Structure formats: C-alpha cells, structure tokens
Amino acid sequence: IGIPWDLDRNNGGVAILPPYEKSGNSEWYTGTANAIYQNMRYIDSYNPDYVLILSGDHIYKMDYEVMLDFHKENNADVTIATMPVPIEEASRFGIVIADDDKRINAFEEKPVHPRSNLASMGIYIFSWPVLKEALLALKDQENCDFGKHVIPYCFENDRRMFAYEFNGYWKDVGTLGSYWEANMELVDLIPEFNLYEEYWKIYTKNDAIEPLYIAKGGHVERSIMGEGCECYGHVEHSVIGANVKIGRGAVIRDSIIMCDTEIGSNVTIDKSIIAENCKVGDNVTLGFGQEKPNVLNESIYSFGLVTIGEDSVIPDGVKIGKNTAISGVTYEEDYKDGVLEGGEVIIKAGDGK
C-alpha cells in the first residue's frame, strides 16, 4: 500500500485499520474519536510522544512538521489547526477563540452566533498521554467525536491548547456539493489548488494504459481528462477519469465522470456526478428543468446535481432532472414516460431486479 507515494517503507508507511466487529463487546466505529479509541492498542505499540489526527474528506497542502514544531515550542497538550473564514459562514464550523499568543480561551462547536471567525480545520496534534486519557474518560460517550466531545473535554480539564493558523487552500468535501465545487475549481484557468506546482507536485498511481484520444470532431475545453479516454463528443469545464468513452454528438458540461464509464451518442450531461463503471445509453439527457427538493434526502442530493452511483446503467432515450439520485441497473420501464423528474430517485440493487 502507498507505493506511488513512497510509503511502502521498512520504517513507517501506511496501515489500513478498517472498522469491523470482533467477538465480544467491540463495535463498528461510531464517531471520529471512537475510531481512535478502538485502535489505541495499535497506537500504543509505537509508544509515540505525539499523535496527528486528520480528516479523510478535506483537500489541502500542509507541512505537518511546521505545525508539530509549533506544538512543541508552546509545550502544548493540544494544537488545533485553524483558518479564518468569512464571519457569515462561521456557524458551519467549530470556532476557536484565542489570545494574542494563540492560546485557546474558548471553543464553540458550530455556534449560532460565533464570537470569532477562526475555524477549526479538523486537524489536531495531541500529546499522546493527553489524548489517551481523554479517550478513556469518554469511552462510553455515544458517537464520540473530536469536535463535539474530545476538544471540549480537554478544554474543561485545563489542558494547554493552542491554535495553529493556516492560510493556504482548504476545502471540506464531505458533501456532494462541496465535492463537485472542489473538482470544478481544478479546471479554473489558474486553480487556487494547483496540482502542478513545481515545488509541491501531487502524485498518483500511474497505470500503464494508452493515452487520451480526441477524435476528429471531438472537442475538449477547460477540462481534465485521464489516460485511456476516447472522446468523440464535446467536453467543457469537466473532470473526466481514466478509460471513459464519450460517444459522438455527446455534450458534457460542468460534470465529474469517474473511470471506466461509457457515455453514449447524442447525450447531454449538465452538472452531474457519475461514478465508476457506469453506462449511459444513447440520446440521454441529464440535468434538465428546475431544481426540486429531493424526496429521499434533500440535504444530501441537492445543489442541482444529478448523482449516479457506481455500476449503474441508464437506458437509451431517458431524461433525468436535477437533484436526482440513481443507483443500479435501470430499465426504460423505471422511467415514467421516459422521464425522472427533478428531486426523484431510483435505487436498485444488483441487476435492478
């Protein structure tokens, strides 16, 4: 694991610790802090002085060594990475109130009336004995979470807590809308989060596949396309994964299409997220009409997006509205008069039967 990033080392590397239920009284991870609690024995085996806690759904570039130096210089028990946000957006975040020396005086989890615009990034450095003591004290806390439980516990117990201020690009992509936004920002003329900076390049696994092919009559504008793609249509302001096939007459705008997906001929796709290994038939329209609240979960399936899950099939000739969700192999009879109206869903398993 981690070969493309030089993480398959004898010392260090990456270990995946997935949640699973063992015999006895163990359980699936019920919160961010509970996940660490259930792996305390693994962490203890390394006898660390410090533990760095990160979220897996954030995008940023940070030199953690600088943050660790800040933690050591202040003899901190807990250091929280923070960044300033517009005050009108501050209620979406855990908010830190710190003095001129960056010592934290208060912490508010998503306050209605925030007293500061310094937002927690969900990145923490703990001195391991302090974190271990907090996790043991909170082991019976339901859905134990760092922002809601561990940080307040440390503050209430007078731990030395400091705010490390970060001013680079950072984006939480924990929702479909923010995930779509982050991808669209990558195709800006000068992206704020630049994958190609000489001094800090972003590497990934390089599969040995054929190069991108754009056919005569095909057109690609302000987009990122992976290797192995074949484009016979028009792609604009989109992010396309590897081995995607785009048929003649297809028009794709403001969309994310993941690897190994096939798009038919004369298809129109607007503002959609299509997962891996899907098949979209000929003469299909995705993203038409007005936005309507999603009937399954309007907070998740929103932002005017069409969301199609992995291994799904969309039959020829159908029209699909905004704020919709589709998963599974679907057939013409699943679409009333050939249409899935805005806000509706089709969720199937396996072959759709």
Regions from the PLM with identified roles:
Residues 1-59, 64-66, 70, 98, ...:
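Conserved N-terminal catalytic core of the sugar/cofactor nucleotidyltransferase
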Residues 5-8, 103, 142:
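A short alpha-helix-loop-beta-strand transition element characteristic
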Residues 23-24, 59-60, 88, 171, ...:
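Glycine-/small-residue-rich active-site loops that bind phosphorylated ligands and cofactors
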Residues 29, 61, 125, 145, ...:
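Short aromatic/basic micro-patch
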Residues 47, 61-129, 133, 137-138:
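Conserved core of the sugar-phosphate nucleotidyltransferase
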Residues 129, 136-353:
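Left-handed beta-helix
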